Amino acid sequence: MRTIAFKLTVLCLLLITCVSAGAQSVISIYVRPDGKTDAAGSIKDPVNSLLQALVIAETKVPKQPKSIEIILREGTYFLSNTLEITKNSGWTSKVPLTIKAYKNEKAVLHGGKIIKPELLKQVTDQQYASRFLPEVRNKIRQISLDDAGIANIGKLRTFGFSRPMAPAWLEIFVNGTPGILARWPNHGTVPIVNVIDTGSIPRWGDKSNRGGTFTYAGTNRPSRWKNPEKAWISGYFMWGYADDAVQLNKIDTAEKIINTKGPAHYGFGNGKPWRAWYAYNLPEEIDTAGEYYVDQDTRTLYFMPPDNMGKVEISELETPLLAMEDVNDITLKNLYFTCGRGMGISMERTNGVKINACTFTNLGMMAIFMGKGVKPDDLSSNEGGTPTSRTAGNIVQYMYDHSTYDWESGKNNGITDCEIYNTGTGGIYMGGGNRLTLEAGNNFVENCRIHDFNRLEKTYRPGVWVTGVGNHVSNCEIYNAPSVGIFMHGNNHLIEYNNLHHLDLDADDMGALYFGRNPSEQGHIVRYNYFHHIGGQHKTMAVYHDDGACGMQVYKNVFYKAGTVAGFIGGGRDNPYTNNIFIDTKFAAHIDDRLKNWARAVLDKDGLFQQRLELVNYNKPPYSVQYPMLAKYWEDDPATPKRNTFSKNLLVNIKQRAEGHAEWLPFLADNYETNTDPGFVDYENGDFRLSKTSEVWKKIPGFEAIPMEKIGYQKRP
């Protein structure tokens, strides 16, 4: 017994020593909004800013090479400039750094101002007040932006498909809810009736900057607008995948004719249900809670508050709230990023940075931008530009035009357990890896909830934009957006265990997951995902292999009410669909030979595909080794879709198995189609796991169960 007691005593002492050593291996620096500038940074004597905490951390590294944690106490930390954690600003990355909130407290990094209640006043200019509708006139309040300390009130700009991304204009948030620039109609759009002049069309090379002219009908509402030349219109003016926004020039309210100051990217059209517009930036249209208008001349904000008005915030900072560059081994945890006109976090050339359990909301751009963007030469054009830090700009078009561009996203960076919502231009933009060597970036987005991420720009501003090589998106719930959930470029990406739903709600000819137009971008795997409730009134897809896309394996996914077409293959090859479940969708798949007809120009000699293939040396290692069929692309009749097989899939209540010619998408005999419940655990309530007695096990020998319970966002203990 004495021997046992002695051993236990020694063990306890060892444990105490280890715990003590562990505790001493971390230096803690505390921050509190009401702390002191010259404080020591202890829990009882905290500093008052993150910047000061970083200064203390930098001084401690040479003396005590231990891990450092900066702990933020509850409160709001206002940022008038970007907070920098960079090699140039002094962080050496010699020790791991963690920045986190204290226990369960809420630490907010804020890029704007919280407006004091006494600054919210009744409208004093009665002549101006007469512009408001009589029924709401007494409810509208005004804020002097000078009194609120807002120096830069911003300005509206063109935005939309193939236009550069840029910081938003001044925005107001009431009770955490984004305000809306006063618009009409409050919901929906007004059809374009007839097009008198489509205007110049920048997309097809016309740079004359001529506005368009079209007619509307059925309303006299514009006759109320005193200064229509200050108003803007937005909508899908030509194609249902291309939103746009342009300033008005004038309105003939008698003839119901609208003329715009500048051109729409694709010009104006009519005759399609999405070809419509709504007008905004109109003080006369403040008629619902949250609507606002900024008078640039008087620097006054007018808005209609809700009945339960609490906190009022105004965004101001146009640069990122936080920038990390040339640094390693940094962890951000339980932080709250909000109220910036630009992006939440910008990262460049980072390694091992982890962003965990953070919230990003009410931002004018995206939450996280992992890499270097492209500063546009012209804010209205998507052409050209210069790679630039801490910006987004023309990055989407630039990557399209320069498909091997390394935008310096770093490697081994991860975004986990975060929530992103109410952002203006998407969620997470992530690169990493080398498209010439196929070296993986190993960057990842895991277990995040990303929703309502297109407040301002509607198309091709996805929940996750993933480029480069060897990056992955897993266990994310991505939902409630007018267009794309995941937009891909590059090679060897893994998309798994995601719940993608209520996407493509407004757009036409778009997919919840989209990639295409580059046959060298291969090696992708899409598995164990749940695509459901995709699309609105127009043609949409769950997985969109656009314009000759090749080399994506799609297996063990569930597609339920997954748009018009669950898997849309636009002329490509080597896109097998295996062991998937398709339920209550018009077409399980689509196949066409567009590279033989309307899209054949991409195969021209010295054309787009030849340029993109030769850029990566497609017929030499490593491409010829990883993708052996690609090495013979030109000898293998590239205009004909091939090797797009459909095997071991379950189709339940599908109106037609495929849209297109069967020889291009062979349905093998091991698929099973039925119009009745095949033995789901609970068909009616959406539990599409197969019961042990399901007929599928016999109908499709070798069919493997899809682990529905592992799909989507997983709550952590």
Where are the language model's segments positioned?
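Glycine- and acidic/polar-rich repeat regions and solenoidal domains
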Residues: 82, 92, 343-346, 364-413, ...
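A broad, structural surface signal
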Residues: 55, 250, 416, 474-475, ...
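Bacterial Sec-dependent N-terminal signal peptides
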Residues: 1-26
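Extracellular polysaccharide-degrading/modifying enzymes targeting complex plant/algal/animal polysaccharides
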Residues: 26, 30-348, 354, 361, ...
